[in-house]
Amino acid sequence: MATKNSNLQRWLTGIVLAVVLLLIIFLGSLELFAAAIMLIIIIGMWEYNSIFFGPGFLKEKTEGLILAVFIPVTVLFGNEQWLTALLAFAVMAVFIVFLWKISEDSFDMSSVNKVLFGMLYIPLLTSHFIMLRKLDRGIEWVMLVLVIGIVGDTVALYVGKFFGKKS
């Protein structure tokens, strides 16, 4: 159960990060915004890899991190055709790396599933913020998505605390 101190720390951290994020969104260039999104993607992939793979699996983790960098770069500098080509290449690359691990004793595709899901879930979906920012009124679209997400998460947190199961 969260104490008042941890709740205060959560709010203070959120406010500081919100100020930095708002400065980048409103005053930063598209490239700075994309760099911030890329940093968030890399941190997210690092966490994803540590949760889903655990120790070992260096090839899969490296593959996921490399793809996590290429996807937002392609979204920033390329177009939809480039992104589609990169995703097709990425799927093939994941399977090729998997082929090197196959032995006659075992055939476990879970590492392929984890890499592909991580690639689609974190870098591809988060790169949509860059796509939104590139639109004519991109700043407004980015802010709308962020406000909807933040309000939804905050309401869920406090509704869960209020109506949640008391142990």
Describe the residue ranges of each PLM region.
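Membrane-embedded alpha-helical bundles of polytopic integral membrane proteins
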Residues: A2-S167
